[in-house]
């Protein structure tokens, strides 16, 4: 599959990159840790994570744990860099990995994937916490396998089922506010699917978009005042501002149905969400196969995780929401 490469990949001077040191805590059961790896081999892996919030942190931890478990921690050096929520910072991060000639790059979130996509055609790249790869990479003929040097995992949960949760939890709903960051293409994609589905059921949907975190409070206040229910997709900007959003929707008594459990825990009543730790772990398993020469990344389809119906017990009680059967309370 041919790729449209960006002509502009200039490094931005003076950018501060946050390095995160992750340990192997929370690992799944380990095997012998180094099956199929030469005794003196140490793989170099670079991780570019867009920002720090529960979902992305869990995905990176799962990825690290999988590689340490499968390859053995003595056989892999993982350099985790966080772009502090600035998508432009992803470019110098991945360029540094390319210059170091790492064996594999893991891109956690869409802007990180886009930066890696534009940086190299030879180093294997695995994405995670990416909703729709065709949208993220501008691939009009995407059908499940990106090809070339890119594959990964998707955090996409069934969007029509998420939309149905709004009807299950707030059956009297007439207006839904779609709250998201307009700078995140995967958020735009999710909003369109949910908007079309609910509109066909006679629900009035209105988009409330913010361009960055500075606009979140004002836009959320407007959405909460105008809407019976707010829907927030898997959106990194929203995920980093759940405390702000939660304060506003509590005051307005406006329930939020979220695209992932981190947002739900911070400001929502319910979500149909995957485990980001498991998603990252699956990505790490794919990475181990590639590094050991057991799989050709160009032939590896995008993989998905199973989704579960979860609810925020405290928020539901506060807003008087009756939760139907089939939902599990969020832990913590």
Language-model features: where?
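An alpha-beta-alpha
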Residues: 45-47, 63, 151-198, 299-316
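Beta-alpha junction/loop-to-helix N-cap segments that form part of ligand/metal-binding clefts
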Residues: 79-141, 235-259
């Amino acid at each position: 599959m041919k790729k449209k490469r960006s002509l502009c990949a200039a490094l931005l001077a003076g950018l501060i990159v946050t390095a995160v040191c992750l340990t192997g805590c929370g690992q799944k059961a380990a095997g012998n840790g180094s099956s199929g790896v030469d005794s003196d081999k140490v793989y170099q892996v670079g991780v570019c994570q867009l920002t720090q919030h529960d979902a992305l942190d869990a995905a990176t931890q799962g990825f690290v744990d999988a590689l340490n478990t499968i390859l053995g921690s003595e056989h892999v050096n993982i350099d985790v860099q966080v772009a502090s929520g600035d998508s432009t910072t992803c470019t110098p991060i991945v360029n540094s990995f390319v210059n170091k000639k790492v064996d594999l790059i893991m891109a956690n979130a869409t802007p990180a994937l886009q930066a890696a996509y534009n940086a190299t055609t030879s180093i294997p790249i695995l994405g995670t916490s990416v909703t729709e790869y065709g949208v993220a990479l501008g691939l009009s003929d995407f059908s499940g396998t990106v090809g070339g040097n890119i594959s990964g995992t998707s955090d996409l949960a069934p969007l029509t089922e998420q939309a149905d949760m709004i009807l299950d939890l707030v059956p009297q709903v007439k207006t839904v506010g779609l709250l998201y960051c307009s700078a995140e293409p995967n958020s735009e994609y999710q909003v369109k699917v949910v908007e079309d589905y609910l509109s066909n059921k006679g629900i009035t949907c209105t988009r409330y978009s913010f361009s960055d975190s500075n606009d979140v409070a004002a836009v959320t206040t407007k959405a909460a005042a105008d809407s019976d229910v707010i829907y927030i997709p898997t959106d990194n900007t929203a995920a980093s501002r759940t405390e702000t959003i939660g304060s506003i929707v509590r005051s307005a008594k406006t329930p939020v149905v979220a695209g992932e459990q981190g947002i739900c825990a911070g400001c929502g009543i319910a979500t149909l969400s995957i485990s980001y730790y498991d998603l990252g772990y699956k990505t790490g398993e794919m990475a181990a196969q590639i590094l050991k020469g057991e799989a050709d990344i160009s032939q590896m389809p995008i993989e998905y995780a199973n989704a579960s119906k979860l609810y925020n017990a405290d928020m539901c009680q506060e807003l008087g929401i009756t939760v139907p059967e089939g939902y599990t309370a969020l832990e913590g």
